[in-house]
């Protein structure tokens, strides 16, 4: 039996270039408001929506995220997207996680600005199938 069976895990993805207090506030609110067991921060490896030429290298962004989440025992950093060779599409990441941890309930956390064009994402229906979608409204914090 896997150690995440039946657990509620929040997923907060992004370029995190850099990670900032807003990301941490969104994660804390989701953790508290939805009684999550953990929130996993997932830095994008090859983001479909960003020009990577000016971005900080993925391993450095992962290091920044790891340092930022270290004080919080319920925050974790995952390199699942950085380790992947393909473009970091959310539906692929959630599919991988759901295959690894089939009994875990995932909560995908996104900002309200992303909701405006969520229907343009690659396979939003798979995202909704693999996770509960939480939308963070900025004026909440």
Give, region by region, the residue ranges found by the protein language model.
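Nucleotidyltransferase catalytic core that binds NTPs
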Residues: 1-141
């Amino acid at each position: 039996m896997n150690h995440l069976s039946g657990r509620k895990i929040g997923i907060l993805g992004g370029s995190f270039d850099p990670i900032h207090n807003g990301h941490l506030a969104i994660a804390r609110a989701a953790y508290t408001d939805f009684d999550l067991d953990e929130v996993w921060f997932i830095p994008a490896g090859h983001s479909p929506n960003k020009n990577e030429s000016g971005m900080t290298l993925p391993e450095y962004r992962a290091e920044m995220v790891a340092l930022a989440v270290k004080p919080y025992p319920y925050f974790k950093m995952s390199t699942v997207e950085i380790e992947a060779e393909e473009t970091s599409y959310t539906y692929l990441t959630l599919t991988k996680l759901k295959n690894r941890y089939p009994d875990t309930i995932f909560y995908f956390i996104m900002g309200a600005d992303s909701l405006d064009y969520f229907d343009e994402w690659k396979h939003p229906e798979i995202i909704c199938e693999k996770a509960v979608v939480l939308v963070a409204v900025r004026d909440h914090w």
